[in-house]
Structure formats: structure tokens, C-alpha cells
């Protein structure tokens, strides 16, 4: 009986040890243990599943790209669950600026990360990797505090009131000149034909100037419409979100078939659009892309989903 109790206690201790997750450790080359944030993740759940604390997560990610703290986690982001060098952020197929442009290599100095692939002068790089001048681009709440601050010009101004004033002033001067020119007309000795010619000439100049000023169109202002994030799904050829991948994003169901299912090889548009569905096939570690029709991958092994829901079904 005593032996049975000892064996039972040993089994219980073994199960308890197995149930307690071992804390993640850095890789052999000094990088932190990388974790991909999933839907509905919280720091509390992540910490419990990996045998660490929320304070550990905050500490490990002080230098992680776009880290805003445990209160603001973004699905699909890479974070650290151990000490070590932070990972490069996930490449975004539609990115044209910042470190998430596909093919961007890790900088020798991590402090230079935010300045990689900069926008043209006077434009800001938004956290989703595109350039613009409106507040949604320039109030980049996800850029690390140490990153460079973009210099932004104000919105295009409407025609200044000075131009209007000059027009009025010009008109006033001409009125004065007209009045001054009309003084000789009050002289009975002046010839009527001379007066008529002068009045006509002044009137013509005034009308021409006024008409030209009135037709000047105001400069177009920058649209302030809010940016709407599309749903995105990235399907990888290997486990752990590695290898070649499909990247799809969209706003509506215009390109879905009658069964409500996306056809990866159904001629989906490969150019970015703000209204439809886009599909690209990325190869060579994200350096090159082609249409999804050119891929032969039929069974993706892992995926990342943003701004949407995913359901998996088993079938024969």
C-alpha cells in the first residue's frame, strides 16, 4: 500500500511538471523566442501558456517594432517571449515604405529600423506601410518612440485672401483712374469722341481683369476621409508561418463564387485595390510575387488572419 502511495505521488508530481509550461529561451544566435499574436490573445493568456508573467512580456518587448504594450495587441504581429534580439516585423505585401516592405533585410543598427524605405519628402509612412500626408498617415501611433519623426507639410491651402484684396485694390485703382480720366469730360471744351475712346478702353481693361480673377479655380484640398482596414489572410507553405505564401485582402465579396468561397486559382486580381479582393503569390523569401494562379500550393500549412474570422472544416 505504501509503495502504491509513493508511485501515485510520483505520477502526480510528473503530471504537474508536464502541465507547467517551460519558459521560452532565446535562439542559439541570440534572437528572442518569437511568438505570433493570435485572435483574442491577451498578455495574461500568453504568459500563462508559456510559464512567464505579463511583466516579463512588457520587458522582453521594449525594443520590438510597434510595441504599444499589453493593452494594445495586434493580431499577426511578432513579439518576444524571452530575452534576446527582437524579430523583424512581418512583411506586408502591399507595403511601400518602412521595415515591412517585402525583402527588407535587418539593419545593422536596430535604431535605424523605422527609417528604412522612407517615403518621398513631406509624406509620412503609416503603420501599414503606405505613404500619405493626412492625419491617418502622420499620427503614426505604432511607430517606436526612438524612430525618426517625419516632417509634414500642412494641407494644401485654399486661395489666399490677399489675391482677392489685390483684385479689389486693382479695381479701386482703375475706378480712381476712370474718375480721374472723367474729369476732362466735364470740360465742355473736350471732344466727345476722345472721351468715348478713353471710357471704352478703361472699361475693357477692368472687365478683362475681373473675369480672369473670377475664373481662377481653388487648389484641390487633400481628402480627409478615414482609412478602412481590409481583412487580410496570409497562407504559408510551411508550418510556423514560414516559406512561400499567398496573401489575400479585401473589403467585400465581389470576387466570391456562389458558394461563398474564395478560389485561389480563379483569376483573382493581383493589383492592390481599395474596393475589391487582391491575391498575390510571394516567393524567394518575400522578394518576388506573381498572380495566385501561378502557384501550385494546394494545402497551406499555416496562416495569419487580420480583421476577420476563419473557420476550418474537415471533409473527405
UniProtKB/Swiss-Prot annotation:
It holds the Pfam family LysM14_C. Residues 182-203 have a biased composition (Low complexity). Residues 159-180 have a biased composition (Polar residues). Residues 33-81 form the LysM domain. GO terms for molecular function: chitin binding. Induction: Highly expressed during the infection and development of decay of apple fruit. Does not affect lesion development on apples. This is Secreted LysM effector LysM3. Keywords: Chitin-binding, Glycoprotein, Signal, Virulence. The LysM (lysin motif) domains are small globular domains involved in binding chitin in eukaryotes. LysM3 contains one LysM domain. In plants, chitin acts as a microbe-associated molecular pattern (MAMP) that is recognized by lysin motif (LysM)-containing plant cell surface-localized pattern recognition receptors (PRRs) that activate a plethora of downstream immune responses. The keyword Nucleotide-binding does not apply. Residues 148-203 are annotated as: Disordered. Glycans are attached at residues 173, 193. Residues 1-21 form the signal peptide. Might have a role in sequestration of chitin oligosaccharides (breakdown products of fungal cell walls that are released during invasion and act as triggers of host immunity) to dampen host defense. Coiled coil: none annotated. Disruption phenotype: Exhibited slightly lower rate of radial growth. InterPro entries: Endochitinase-like_sf, LysM12-like, LysM_dom, LysM_dom_sf. Belongs to the secreted LysM effector family.
Amino acid at each position: 500500500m505504501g509503495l502504491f502511495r509513493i508511485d501515485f505521488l510520483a505520477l502526480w508530481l510528473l503530471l504537474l511538471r508536464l502541465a507547467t509550461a517551460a519558459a521560452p529561451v532565446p535562439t542559439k544566435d541570440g534572437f528572442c523566442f518569437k511568438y505570433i499574436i493570435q485572435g483574442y490573445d491577451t498578455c495574461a493568456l500568453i504568459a500563462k501558456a508559456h510559464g512567464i508573467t505579463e511583466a516579463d512580456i512588457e520587458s522582453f518587448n521594449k525594443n520590438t517594432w510597434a510595441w504599444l504594450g499589453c493593452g494594445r495587441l495586434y493580431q499577426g504581429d511578432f513579439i518576444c517571449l524571452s530575452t534576446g534580439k527582437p524579430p523583424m516585423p512581418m512583411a506586408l505585401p502591399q507595403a511601400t515604405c518602412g521595415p515591412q516592405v517585402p525583402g527588407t533585410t535587418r539593419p545593422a543598427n536596430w535604431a535605424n529600423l523605422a527609417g528604412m524605405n522612407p517615403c518621398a519628402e513631406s509624406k509620412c509612412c503609416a503603420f501599414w506601410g503606405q505613404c500619405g500626408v493626412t492625419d491617418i498617415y502622420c499620427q503614426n501611433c505604432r511607430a517606436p518612440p526612438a524612430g525618426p519623426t517625419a516632417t509634414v507639410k500642412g494641407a494644401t491651402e485654399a486661395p489666399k485672401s490677399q489675391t482677392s484684396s489685390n483684385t479689389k485694390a486693382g479695381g479701386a485703382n482703375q475706378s480712381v483712374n476712370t474718375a480721374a480720366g472723367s474729369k476732362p469730360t466735364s470740360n465742355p471744351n473736350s471732344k466727345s469722341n476722345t472721351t468715348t475712346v478713353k471710357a471704352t478702353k478703361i472699361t475693357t481693361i477692368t472687365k478683362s481683369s475681373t473675369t480672369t480673377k473670377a475664373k481662377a479655380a481653388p487648389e484641390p484640398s487633400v481628402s480627409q476621409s478615414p482609412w478602412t482596414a481590409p481583412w487580410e489572410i496570409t497562407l504559408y507553405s510551411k508550418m510556423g508561418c514560414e516559406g512561400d505564401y499567398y496573401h489575400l485582402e479585401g473589403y467585400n465579396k465581389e470576387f466570391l463564387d456562389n458558394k461563398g468561397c474564395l478560389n485561389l486559382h480563379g483569376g483573382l486580381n493581383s493589383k492592390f485595390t481599395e474596393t475589391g479582393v487582391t491575391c498575390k503569390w510571394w516567393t524567394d523569401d518575400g522578394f518576388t510575387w506573381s498572380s495566385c494562379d501561378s502557384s501550385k500550393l494546394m494545402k497551406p500549412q499555416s496562416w495569419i488572419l487580420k480583421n476577420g474570422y476563419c473557420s476550418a472544416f474537415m471533409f473527405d
